[in-house]
Amino acid sequence: MNYSALKLPYLELLVSKTTLKGENEGITVFPCLRNIGNGTAFKVCIKKVCIKEVTEKIYDEVCITAPFQNEYGNSFVERGNEIQAILRMSSFGGRVTLVVQFEDIEENVYEQRFGFSFDVNISNEISAADYTVTSPKLIKQKEINEDSES
């Protein structure tokens, strides 16, 4: 077992409650993920986004494979080592789960989950927000070819 995986870079959450102005008025930028690791090269792929919208006590969960544009007006923006999920908030609040996969330089694949729940006030601003982050989990280890015995 290769324990160097534990030193891998991972993503942290930046909770941003910025409402974009102008053309995109009313879209709240929330959340943002950032690489805070040790600089090891890795690539990130947001695999799945689940949006559970609270609409008058009816829970609607929609899962989309990212990157995506859908009826909620959601999209992803990458800036350097940050990935922003731009989510158009429902007037009732709701819950969003991002399933993020990343791959290290040795092609091991890790998965990390970020869950957000939020309430939106009458001015369409986030009035309360809570989030959970799971530790990166190894989901696929590079297959080592052990045929060559010398």
How does the language model describe each region?
Residues 1-42, 47-50:
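Membrane-proximal alpha-helical anchors
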Residues 20, 38, 42-150:
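An amphipathic alpha-helical interaction surface
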